Amino acid sequence: MARKWNLPFLLLPLVLGIPLVRGSNPLPLVVNTWPFKNATEAAWWTLVSGGSALDAVEKGCAMCEKEQCGGTVGFGGSPDEVGETTLDAMIMDGTAMDVGAVGGLRRIKNAIGVARKVLEHTTHTLLVGDSATKFAVSMGFTSEDLSTNTSRALHSDWLSRNCQPNYWRNVIPDPSKYCGPYKPPDFLEQNNRAHKEVDIHSHDTIGMVVIHKTGHTAAGTSTNGLKFKIPGRVGDSPIPGAGAYADDMAGAAAATGDGDTLLRFLPSYQAVEYMRGGDDPARACQKVISRIQKYYPKFFGAVICANVTGSYGAACNRLPTFTQFSFMVYNSLHNQAIEEKVDCM
């Protein structure tokens, strides 16, 4: 799926001295993963109120953190093996190629806000764990418990099911039958990589891309990660080029899904590079999915892409339980946030 506008055609009336018809330019543009409408609207109204592309991404993702979108963004969701909720987020400025990100952030609700502070007040790209929390507190954020009755109940139920599912392999006791603690066996058998069936509702990261009316780009993500992950695990979301990527010379992209798989292919960076090479956004997204399918045909994932002329698209990998991917779009041709769907390939 794609919506395309030909830039030379848009510029022709200006060359001839003819004013453009109001609303004929699709910019600005907001696209985000999943039907998180309030996040889309928060980003859009930030833009029309005079905010930058970076401001829009931050406000949009922050709305999802506040609303706990799908239980997979923000506090109170996706407890790890010990029952704690931690957060990952990143934000990227495609004009300056600056990035701020946090991974395994504890006790701070506004992860995307902390990522913005990393971008603005340090020369680093990524801060993690307890030290990221200390940084956040120094920046004025409040330290508070991220667990809720809902996340505690999820963890309790998981323990009652012998810690299933989990993400261990080649350890004893058998992780498919028992809880840990685990340790490596004396002799490691070399067997084929096992594929774990995934719950698609445990991966609904918000990824957002914004193209400002000036052509400036930004992208970002926010997530509470994988349910019942091994403590310390960080997925694709806070990694530039994996979770999201933006470059004013081409466009922006964001990914959602099985972060451990996506991280190995830098799908957002690859999508932007495909657009730089001339592919329209829909085709760029499709090529990214095809590239991963060659190695992981059963992976769960989707990508959104937008170029600097206002064209956008998306693609996803088809599974028995995942045949369509929903994403949100708001541009100057719409008077509201629109949910669009693409058939998986």
Swiss-Prot record:
Matches recorded under CDD domains: Glycosylasparaginase
Catalyses which reaction(s): N(4)-(beta-N-acetyl-D-glucosaminyl)-L-asparagine + H2O = N-acetyl-beta-D-glucosaminylamine + L-aspartate + H(+)
Cellular compartments per GO CC: cytoplasm; endoplasmic reticulum; extracellular space; lysosome
PANTHER family for this protein: L-ASPARAGINASE, N(4)-(BETA-N-ACETYLGLUCOSAMINYL)-L-ASPARAGINASE
Function: Cleaves the GlcNAc-Asn bond which joins oligosaccharides to the peptide of asparagine-linked glycoproteins.
Signal sequence bounds: 1-23
Record's keyword annotation contains Cell cycle: no
Enzyme Commission number: 3.5.1.26
Compartments in which it is found: Lysosome
Main location: other
UniProt cross-references to InterPro entries, sorted A to Z: Ntn_hydrolases_N, Peptidase_T2
Keyword Signal found: yes
Gene Ontology MF terms in the entry: identical protein binding; N4-(beta-N-acetylglucosaminyl)-L-asparaginase activity; peptidase activity
Protein name: N(4)-(Beta-N-acetylglucosaminyl)-L-asparaginase
PTM comment text: N-glycosylated. Cleaved into an alpha and beta chain by autocatalysis; this activates the enzyme. The N-terminal residue of the beta subunit is responsible for the nucleophile hydrolase activity.
Organism whose genome encodes this protein: Rattus norvegicus
